[in-house]
Amino acid sequence: MNIHNKNIVITGAANGIGHALAKRIIQESPKSISLIDISSSVNEVARSMNADSYVVDVANENDFQSVLNSIIDKNNSIDLFCSNAGI
């Protein structure tokens, strides 16, 4: 799959599988990458990758939907969503 110039969202990106996935995907030059995690350490991870970060509990449907709406407002779309929270 070609992800160059795509808008990517990765949950659970502060560590583990989500973090590893973000590090790999950033090498493919996506148009944007948005990292989501319940831990505020996602902010540091995002800064190191020149990505956007959002601290939210994905189990809280209203808060999570608000973050997704913000991402769509900023980037016009989400082309690839990688759900890794809680894995």
Which role does the model predict for each range below?
Residues N7, A14-G16:
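Conserved glycine-rich cofactor-binding loop
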Residues M1-V9:
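Flexible N-terminal pre-Rossmann segment of NAD(P)-dependent oxidoreductases
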Residues V9, S34, Y54, F81:
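Conserved Rossmann-like nucleotide-binding pocket used by diverse enzymes
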Residues I26-E44:
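Conserved glycine-rich Rossmann-like NAD(P)H-binding loop of the short-chain dehydrogenase/reductase
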Residues Y54-V67:
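The beta1-alpha1 cofactor-binding region of Rossmann-like NAD(H)/NADP(H)-dependent oxidoreductases
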Residues I71-N76:
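Glycine-rich phosphate-binding loop signature in dinucleotide/nucleotide-binding domains
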Residues H19-K23:
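Residues forming the Rossmann-fold NAD(P)(H) cofactor-binding site
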Residues T11-G12, I78-G86:
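Rossmann-fold scaffold of SDR-type NAD(P)-dependent oxidoreductases
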